[in-house]
Amino acid sequence: MRANNLTLLTDLYELTMMQGYFKNPTDQIVVFDMFYRDNPCGGGFAICAGLEQVIEYIENLRFTDADIEYLRGLSIFEEDFLEYLRSFHFTGDIYAIPEGTVIFPREPMVKVVAPIMEAQLVETAILNIMNHQSLIATKAARVCYAAKGDGIMEFGLRRAQGPDAGIFGARAAVIGGCVGTSCVLTGQMFDVPVLGTHAHSWIMSFPDEYTAFKTYARMYPDACILLVDTYDVLKSGVPNAIRVFEEMREEGIQLKKYGIRIDSGDLAYLSKEAYKMLSAAGFDDATISASSDLDEYLIESLKAQDAKINSWGVGTRLITSNDNPAFGGVYKLAAVKNPETGEFVPKIKLSENTAKVTNPGNKTVYRIYSKSTGKIKADLICLADEKLNPDETMVVFDPVDTWKKTKILGGTYEVRELLVPVIKEGKRVYTSPSVMELRAICQQEQSTLWDESRRFSNPQKVYVDLSPKLYQVKKELIEEMSRKDLEFEEE
């Protein structure tokens, strides 16, 4: 981990391109969009996360003497360029979708408007930060949805792909819905609840399980969750836990947050049997927590089996997004400003794969909500100077399958612009909510989705459409590029 200054958190080619621009001077102001193409885990949406760390990265973006010396030692960069880097700082604008927001493929999550050297340099770090945290926040949202209101504890630090992945992955997991994390440093840095019980080693270090439970319970009577699977859940663990709870009750010690945790075995069967035993002893309000390689699919299955579990510790498969370990965000040039007219000239990247053809121009994104339900009807990508009037009827259509059209009657919908300014002329203009506030925002955001878009198997797609004006720009650019290709072939 390198605190604050992450300027060299970049791919080498960003710096070699910067030197190329420097040696061939240009005053070009450009627009780059960060977006992704496919929802993680085959889901119906993603959660935007990582923006605060992007802002902090921009605020601390400067080359130190040590950075310059290292770059000089690569024998790639010339002295006049290295001297330029000494005074480098970001002067552009950044717009972004706020953290905790539900997002969909192809819409810009982050838009950078800056001199081309600056916009090029920040590509790698923006992708690194946003891809990671958006992935984990999305996975957490899925896991929490499967739990149907039960608390999900993020327990993945020891299995995370290094310290930063553990710290910031836990941050993202809380944004996505987790009630807290086992990572104490994340708790300190972001003021989120830290949670935990004890390990099997605690039990094994005592002469017997009962003594281990009793000692722990006396030390932590207000947070007494006992791990019952060290030896035998039903023959030893649960009976010894009940014995300790009964002794505390007889002594007048108020049991607040108490219960058991099961970390192995048939969680459905064991939880149901443990619940019967606890209830018979008068402890039917005890927490029954489960861990053991959980994810949204296993939790959903356990819920369907009526497992008596009401608290879940999820580690490896959350902090690594085990079944979908990469978010897939990309960063593409979308427009170049004409210095004479001040207008942005749209740029497009073509591909034989139509899904990889970029959307050109300086753009913004509008979310369209149904007035009657509050649910999302569609997202609309527009050119930045376009405004939507919710009193007017509009027709939106799929940018790939253009025959798929939907008419939205005026007066039946509300509109929200998703991209907000976070950096203007190199300075922060945005105050991020706290992580716990972002968690609440994320939960509210997910309530605007239909359940059909949240299911894990074949979710209903939320359409991200292009405005007619933007679609026409894209169509004309594709036709223009096609003509140039034909002219080249004829030559």
Predicted regions and their residues:
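Buried, small/hydrophobic-residue-enriched core segments of structured protein domains
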Residues: 1-29, 38-40, 76, 82-91, ...
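Short amphipathic C-terminal alpha-helix that caps PH/PH-like domains
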Residues: 58, 122, 126-130, 442, ...
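Short acidic, Pro/Gly- and aromatic-enriched capping/linker segments at domain boundaries
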Residues: 94-100, 413-418
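An N-terminal, globular interaction/scaffold subdomain
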Residues: 56-60, 96-99, 103
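Structural motif
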Residues: 151-154, 193-196, 223-226, 258-259, ...
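N-terminal, Lys/Arg-enriched amphipathic/low-complexity engagement segments
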Residues: 26, 30-86
